[in-house]
Amino acid sequence: MRKEFLLVVFLIGLLTKATIAQTQAKRIEKVYTNPLKVQLGDPFVLFAKGTYYMYGTGNPADRGFSAYSSKDLVNWKPEGQIYAYNNKNGWSDPNTPWDGAYWAPEVYEVKGRFYLFYSAQWKVNPAKEMENFKIGVAVSDNPTGPFVDLAPKPLFDPGYPIIDANVFFDSDGKSYLYYSRAAYKHPVESEIASHARKSGKYKEIEESWVYGVELKPDFSGVKGEPVLVLRPPVKLKDKQAAWESLSVTTGEVNRRWTEGSTTFKKGGIYYIMYSANHFGGEHYAVGYATSRSPLGPYKKADENPILHKNTDRGGIVSGTGHNSIVYSPNGKEMYCVYHGRTTTTGSERVVFIDRMKVENGKITVYGPTTKPQKMPAVSPNGK
């Protein structure tokens, strides 16, 4: 009898250990760690048909764009190439610098169809400009393509190179395109430029600026003239000058950037997040500005930058920027999706996803993180 009792106790013990081990395993499964296993720059995430789709700049696409899919925002499956330059309405030239500069794709679902906004080198280039970037729009019946350009030409030509398209759909039915005027051949005088000249760093400073313009409902063009929305600070005493000018003041390059914008609206306030400094350097970082109108004027936040490198604080992440925004599967949690680099990934841009919140008119991004984080919530109760 005693032996039988001991055997029962032993078996219960084994069962308890197994249950504990399974519980611990489940707990381990409910966390994730940055960076994700996706090598892309300028990541944009769309939620459609119950699935997340990620688009971005870089491999494995060949002169175009590829996509990834996920159910939980963490584990991503390659979906292959979704857009190629040589579709029947292709207007770009892959035989140009940066292999055609197929950059920063963003996809939006409108009335059951999917629209891809992107930038590339326009083949109409009589002046042989090195940076002849324009923005195009392609369409597909599926988020994974194939996408075909709406027309055999860019969306519009403002007369200067443009990149980093972002579209905001307002509650009144209007839609707006935000883009970055490339810094190429755009020297700008400022106190920062004057200081760089006097210190012997650079003779001139080129700048990229963010513009906004209303889109035609069918995305065949724009309505009215573009409006300047954001630019680097002019005065040295400006609160934003120090962090937005690091590419210049550290001797990295003679350019200042305002690019990679993403716009959303909450509580009647328009928020535009943007990236500053050289995308290839350690100082690439994210700030934001607010307005009561989609085309401004916008006021930059005093607490900028809200997402930047942590290598100066004992971390391993730098070059954080060009973000998009997405919500968890249960729609409750807000996430910032962005690219960065780590001391182990080197020069390759990899994708990060970190929680963010908007409270009392202020944006907070809880990143960059590289330690285990709780998985995005799936159920309504946050689990």
Question: What is each PLM-predicted segment?
Answer:
Residues 22-383:
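Carbohydrate-active catalytic/glycan-binding domains of CAZyme proteins
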Residues 1-25:
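Bacterial Sec-dependent N-terminal signal peptides
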